[in-house]
């Protein structure tokens, strides 16, 4: 097991070509939000764009579309009820933040994992669907990223006594299923089974609602930009934590909001680039 250090991250992070255009940086697809829970979609979308995706489409319920259009005009919008789910024309997919777990959500989840041939991240309510529809696990494409917090992890894989037990299970499941697991926590684990990293950035300010939604957006953005899924997960977790550390210069861990973290992502990228010179 390795530490996710700044020096290592600098070896895998690619600075942007000054002459590039939006088409060079991928088209991310996020499926997020539901009635009364659109904050998760807004947070994931903002984080995705701040992490560098060239284009972003967010699939939301029709009645909630105005929330996203006002909050993040840079994102394109698709309506959940009429979207054709021709998903493989996108560069990467992140799904689950506050989507709900009703029959319609299960239908969408099943449709996506059955047809997906592009990088995929499963989070939040999509993980909760998976925990109650275990037969769907075998349909998950190889290389898919799962991003559970400890309670979601236990719902998926059974109760564990402590973090060490969860880490052991995560490593074994990742290897067995050929997937990537990001086990979120104080020291987040990123594992492909064959190789595992412990994150070295972040602080207690991330211990509040919206943090996981932002991480979903960030990792999905990196996948859309062409990073291999395991690399995207490493970059996403590290940048997410580094931005929180930078935000802590202006906020306390008690007062920090995930919007403070997202607004600190530019400084996080600059820190990586400046320190690598």
Locations of regions flagged by a protein language model:
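Small-residue (G/A/S/T)-rich helix-start motifs and N-terminal tracts that mark the onset
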Residues: 1-119, 128-143, 150, 154-277
